[in-house]
Amino acid sequence: MITARAFSGKKYAVLGLARSGMAAVESLLASGAEVTAWDRQDNAREALAGRCAIADPMEIELAGFDAVVVSPGVPLNTHPLTAKAEAAGVPIIGDIELFSQAQPELPEHFVVGITGTNGKSTTTALVHHILKEAGVNTVMGGNIGLPIMAQDPLEPNDKGLPVYVLELSSYQIDLTFTLACKATALLNITPDHLDRYENFEAYAASKARLMDMLDPFGVSLLPTSAEAIAPIAAFHNKRGPYEWIGPPYDASNQAEWPSLQGPHNLENAIFASHICGELFLTNGAIARGLRTYPGLPHRMERLGTFDGVLVINDSKATNPASTAPALAAWPAEDGHKRIHWICGGLAKTDNLDECAPHFGNVAAAYTIGEAGALFGELLAPHMKVEPCEMLCEATARALNAAQPGDVVMLSPACASFDQFRDYEVRGDTFREIVGKLTDERPAA
C-alpha cells in the first residue's frame, strides 16, 4: 500500500468504509496516524474493531482533527457533516487527496488525471493498457480498479518513469486539492449528477478544477465541443499549458482497433494517444496498444456473434449522451436498419434528444423498466417499439427479430436502480440471459 510520513502523528476521521475508505484507513494506520472510522454497516465497523476508534464524525468533536476523509458517494451538498467540519475548521478530503499528499514521498513518477461525463473508464483503461504494453510500470485507480491507496508504490524502470493513471469523477475532484498531474484530460461535459450540484454550471466548475491540478511541466487536454468550451472558459484558471482536442478525427486506422468501434471510441482513442504522447511514448507503441486493447465490461462489450447476429452489452450507458455513440457505431446499410435497441430503466432526463440523430440506424426499440412508457412515446414516431418491461423478455424478442448482420444491443440510456443494484449487475444479467438464449446457437 501507499504510506507517507506526512500522515504520522496526525488525526483523521474517515466516513465510509467501502473499498476506498478502508484503503485510506489502512494507509493512515500504517503511516502512524490516529484514525476514527465510521460506516453505517455493522460488518465494516467490526472489521476495524480494536485497531482504531469507531465513532460517527457527526457525534464527536472535530476540532483538532487534521482532516475528515469521506467516500465520494457521501453527498456533501446535503450532508450535515459539511457544515460541521467547516465550523470546526477541518477540511473534508478524499482518498485521491491523501495520494496527492503522499506524492512527494513516492519514487519519481507521473500522474494522469482523466475526467468527463462519458468515456472516462475506457480512456483511463486504454492509457493504462498502452503504457503497460510499452513496458512502462503503471497502475490505474480512482474511479476504476483498486483504490489508489491500496496500490504498491511504483518504481521507475528502463522504459522511464512509472505512471499512475486516475479516472476521476466530479465527486472525487471535489475532494481533491493538491494533485500534481503530468497530463489532465476533460473528454466531454454534458448535464449529469444534477442531484449533487446546484446547476450545470456548478457541475462544469467541478470538472474544470482538474485542469488546474498540474505539475510544473504538465498539460491539460480539452475538448472543442460547443457545450464544453463555455464552462471550461468560465472555470479553468489556465494554470498550465493546454491543448484543444476536437474533430475532424482521423479514422483511417480505426478498423484495426476491434474494441474501439464507434465515434465515441474514436474520440477516446484520440485523447488516449495524445496523453501517451505527453508521456513520451512513440507512435509505434501507441499504435500497438490501440490494436491490442481488450475493452472493458459493460462498455460496448462484444458478447459474441450468434447466427450472424452481433450482441453488445453497453449497460454502462446510463444517460442518452452515452447511448448516442453506440447507436452511431452501426449505421444502416443499403437502407437496412441493423440495431435492435434494448433501452430503459430509471430515466435521468425526459427526452432522448442526444440519441435522435441516430434513430435512422435502429430497426426496433425494446423498452424496459420505469422509463419504458416514456421512451415508447418518444420513439414510436421514429421506429417500431416493443414494450417489454423486463430485460429477459426484451432480449428474447430482440434476438428473435434480428437477422444475420444485425446488432442486438443493450444500451439503456438510463440508470439501473429501478430493477438492478447497479449497471454492472444489469450487464451481467444481460450476459446470462444471452448465454441461456443462445446455448444452441453457433457463436463466433
Model-derived regions, located:
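Nucleotide phosphate-binding/pyrophosphate-handling subdomain across enzymes
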Residues: 3-12, 21-31, 257-362, 377
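Residues in the short beta-alpha loop(s) of Rossmann-like NAD(P)-binding domains
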Residues: 18, 41, 144, 225-226, ...
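Short internal beta-strands
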Residues: 34-40, 220-224, 342-343, 360-370
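Short beta-strand "acidic-cap" motif of Rossmann-like dinucleotide-binding folds
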Residues: 35-39, 139-140, 165, 410
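Residue-level signal for inorganic ion chemistry
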Residues: 16, 28, 68, 114, ...
